[in-house]
């Protein structure tokens, strides 16, 4: 997929406040500070998504219109301890409404920090998506920070841990080096049937 143009067209803070569905969309979700905005910017090949040093900054669902046909959807980060219980409930209600009511959603990319073992909140997200029959692919982020000598071991550790939930594609990526970006775009292209 060649991304010719991208524009942030909607910031949804309440359930149902989404733009009309287009030909298709993919969504990105992960723990706070997993590198979601950086990965989106790498996919877009330009700085569109706001990158913050503060975890838990994205508290809305952000819809990016890509090539005037598709949405790339940035879901709020989860697992940040300093967020109040009320905010966590609002986040859950917003994301659950999106998952249940967005028929144009083809795939969720679950971003997991490749440097460390998956966290309990990652497993909870997997179980939640499985219970809602949401298709997902696991994307390991920040792989440039994993030593080359440890990469195969880290990948195998992640594969083994995630295998208890079934067989899932795992794509190692780095928004710094560009690793995995073209593979991710190819997969998205196939999902959205872009030629």
UniProtKB/Swiss-Prot annotation:
CDD domains: YihA_EngB. Its cofactor is Mg(2+). GO terms for biological process: division septum assembly. One of its GO terms (molecular function) is metal ion binding. One of its GO terms (cellular component) is cytosol. It comes from the Bacteria. Keywords: Cell cycle, Cell division, GTP-binding, Magnesium, Metal-binding, Nucleotide-binding, Septation. GTP binds at residues 30-37, 56-60, 74-77, 141-144, 173-175. Mg(2+) binds at residues 37, 58. Residues 22-194 form the EngB-type G domain. Necessary for normal cell division and for the maintenance of normal septation. Belongs to the TRAFAC class TrmE-Era-EngA-EngB-Septin-like GTPase superfamily. EngB GTPase family. This is Probable GTP-binding protein EngB. The lineage of its organism: Bacteria, Thermotogati, Thermotogota, Thermotogae, Thermotogales.
């Amino acid at each position: 997929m060649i991304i010719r143009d991208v524009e942030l067209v909607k910031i949804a803070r309440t359930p149902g406040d989404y733009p009309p569905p287009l030909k298709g969309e993919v969504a990105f979700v992960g723990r706070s500070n997993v590198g979601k905005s950086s990965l989106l910017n790498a996919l877009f090949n330009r700085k569109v998504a706001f990158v913050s040093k503060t975890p838990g900054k994205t508290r809305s669902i952000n819809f990016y219109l890509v090539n005037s046909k598709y949405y790339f959807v940035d879901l709020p980060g989860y697992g940040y301890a300093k967020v109040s219980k009320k905010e966590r409930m609002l986040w859950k209600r917003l994301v659950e409404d999106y998952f249940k009511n967005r028929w144009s959603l083809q795939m969720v990319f679950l971003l997991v920090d490749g440097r460390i073992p998956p966290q309990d909140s990652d497993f909870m997200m997997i179980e939640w998506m499985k219970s809602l029959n949401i298709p997902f692919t696991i994307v390991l982020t920040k792989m440039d920070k994993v030593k080359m000598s440890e990469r195969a071991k880290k990948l195998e550790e992640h594969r083994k841990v995630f295998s208890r939930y079934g067989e899932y594609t795992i794509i190692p990526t780095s928004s710094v080096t560009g690793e995995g970006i073209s593979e991710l775009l190819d997969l998205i292209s196939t999902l959205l049937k872009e030629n």
